[in-house]
A protein has these predicted regions:
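Single conserved hydrophobic/aromatic residue that forms the stacking wall/gate
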Residues: 1-9
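Transmembrane beta-strands of outer-membrane beta-barrel pores
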Residues: 10-14, 81-89, 124-130, 150-152, ...
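Outer-membrane beta-barrel transmembrane domain signature of Gram-negative proteins
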Residues: 20-121, 129-133
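Extracytoplasmic gating/loop element in the C-terminal half of outer-membrane beta-barrel translocons
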Residues: 27-30, 421-507
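Solvent-exposed loop/turn elements at secondary-structure boundaries
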Residues: 90, 157-225, 244-280, 324
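Outer-membrane beta-barrel signature, preferentially recognizing the C-terminal barrel domain
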Residues: 99, 195-242, 271-296, 332-340, ...
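Conserved small-residue
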Residues: 184, 292-395, 435, 455
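C-terminal beta-signal and terminal closure region of outer-membrane beta-barrel proteins
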Residues: 274-282, 327-350, 455-457, 461, ...
Length: 549
């Protein structure tokens, strides 16, 4: 049998909210704010009709599928056509943003299975995006997946007492990405009609503004392409333990990037030039375990665990680093750049003998930095902000894991789940937590462990305090780099069932164990002023009502 399905969808949203403001005399004044669908404020202009925001979306999708089983053969096919148009109504003078955003594409899938043993599926997508010029607008993205249920073979029957199920999987495919960082129509140049001024006249006293390029067009820009390969194994042991293992590898090419190798003497100056210039790879493995077992009459035990390792690496990047060791090639996408500290300046003579030129007047108790360029063999005696290296671990974890049991004994049940990450770092971007880089709002334990005339420890946890922000001491460096690995008791619950009622106590975010103590490391770097993670406790009961007589 076959069937068809058509869809036409239109949506228009505008948000008008009443809010109030308070002046210096404590008087409240109500104002009207207009917001777009995502909640972002568009305007605070009080003139009705001047500020306006909304969107209109037209989405059309048609689906046709086919399913048939004959003998030991199962065949499924599907064809999809879709097109999408989004019009954002903004009266802010941004003509490009007001133009409709359009996409169009077709997709197809064909799957086949024989006797539940041999599985195959082929997919394809042919998609068009307005972001690219004619000739580069459409991308073709096929994929194929195969599977083999070994445990369904007759020769596997003697092993089923141990290996209840075994399946091998593999897939290969291409995926496309037309997201070019929010920019539109990059194949065409953009011109600023009131650009950089130039002077003329005999005395150079006449200044004019004129049109300048703010972005050069690149008609060759096209889709970013990711090639994905996956190999997996599904295994069940003793009808109780389910294991899933996957290895994945992805290479991404033609990544959209601004050029970094055009010298300024060519006249581009601050004008942007974009292209499909970068590439990277990502690989790792996933592991999941699920165990369920009833023991005797009264016991039931369940355990779940997951583990994922993923590492990405930039393999191509258009750049012109000052030093070769600062190239992004070979680094992870989320690795922070940091200066390397060498403790604190000991005394005025230590400062005087230093060639450190970071900014501001240096003093004893300020952070002392390593001359990285000289360590790499460059003839440079000056320590400045260009003396940086890449950190060891990224700010996005490479290892993510979780585990926890669920145990039931008679009418009593208990469960908990731990979640953790590893190989991750964070950078405290401000001088100290919950503060503003100066003497104000300094926590006691920071003040007690800082460098001071009474505590001239060059390895103090915090440098000297300053009345104003210290440019030298607030550089992104390993002085503020922290290990952000953690393991959390994400949730726990204990319950008791009596007849048709279950009473329980549960909690979420109950405990965090981490070498980083200042705030929840899951929030990442900064100064800790993000909304804190809530610890939640629940007490309740559940009642089952059976209407059967």
């Amino acid at each position: 049998p076959s069937r068809g399905l058509g869809d036409v969808y239109k949506r228009q949203n505008k948000y008008h909210l009443q809010d109030f403001s308070v002046d210096d005399n404590g008087m409240y004044s109500f104002v009207t704010r207009l917001q777009n669908e995502s909640g972002g404020e568009v305007s605070t202009d009080l003139k009705p009709g001047v500020a306006n925001s909304g969107d209109r979306r037209f989405y059309f999708q048609a689906i046709m599928d086919y399913n048939r089983t004959f003998g030991k053969h199962d065949v499924n096919a599907m064809f999809i056509y879709n097109q999408d148009e989004l019009v954002t109504q903004l009266f802010s003078g941004d003509l490009i943003a007001a133009l409709p955003k359009r996409k169009q594409g077709v997709a197809a899938r064909l799957s086949y299975a024989y006797d539940g043993k041999y599985l195959a599926e082929v997919n394809m997508g042919y998609n068009g995006s307005e972001n690219f010029a004619k000739g580069h607008r459409w991308g073709f993205f096929p994929s194929i997946a195969v599977g083999y249920n070994i445990s369904e073979e007759a020769f596997f029957e003697p092993l089923k007492n141990v290996f209840s199920n075994m399946k091998i999987r593999a897939s290969w495919g291409l995926v496309g990405n037309d997201n070019i960082g929010g920019a539109r129509f990059v194949y065409m140049p953009t011109i600023n009609l009131t650009g950089t001024g130039y002077t003329t006249g005999l005395d150079g006293d006449i200044t004019y503004k004129g049109p300048v390029y703010s972005r050069y067009g690149n008609p060759e820009v096209t889709w970013e392409v990711g090639k994905k390969v996956n190999v997996g194994l599904d295994l069940q042991l003793f009808n109780s333990l389910n294991l899933t293992m996957d290895y994945f590898h992805e290479t991404r090419t033609d990544i959209f990037q601004e050029r970094g190798t055009i010298p300024q003497y060519l006249g581009t100056a601050g004008t942007k030039v974009f292209g499909n210039l970068a590439a990277m790879k990502n690989q790792g493995f996933d592991f999941a375990a699920d165990f369920n077992k009833k023991i005797g009459k009264d016991w039931f035990i369940s355990f779940k665990g997951t583990f994922t390792y993923a590492h990405n690496e930039i393999t191509k990047y258009d750049e012109s680093p000052k030093y070769a060791f600062q190239s992004k090639v070979g680094q992870s996408a989320n690795i922070p750049s940091i200066m390397i500290s060498d403790g604190l300046f000991k005394d005025p003579d230590d400062v005087k003998n230093s060639n450190q030129q970071i900014g501001g007047n240096l003093s004893a108790g300020d952070i002392k930095y390593v001359n990285i360029s000289k360590l790499y063999g460059y003839d440079d005696d000056i320590v400045d902000i260009s003396d940086w290296v890449w950190a060891k671990n990224p700010t996005v974890p490479e290892i993510v894991y979780g585990f926890g049991p669920s145990i039931r004994w008679k009418n009593l049940d208990f469960s908990f789940f731990f979640q953790g990450v590893a190989k991750v770092s964070l950078v405290m971007s401000d001088f100290h937590p919950f503060g503003d880089n100066s003497l104000r709002n300094v926590l006691t334990w920071i003040a007690d462990d800082r460098w001071s005339p009474d505590n001239q420890n060059i390895n103090a946890t915090y440098p000297r305090l300053t009345r104003d922000t210290s440019v030298n001491n607030t550089q992104r460096s390993d002085y503020w780099l922290r290990n952000a690995a953690f393991i959390k008791l994400k949730n726990a619950e204990i319950g008791y069932t009596y007849k048709n009622m279950r009473f329980y106590v549960s909690g979420m975010n109950l405990a965090t164990f981490s070498p980083f103590k200042h705030w929840d490391p899951e929030q990442g770097g900064g100064n800790g002023l993000k909304y804190p993670t809530q610890r939640v406790f629940n007490f309740g009961f559940q009642m089952t009502i059976n209407n059967n007589r």
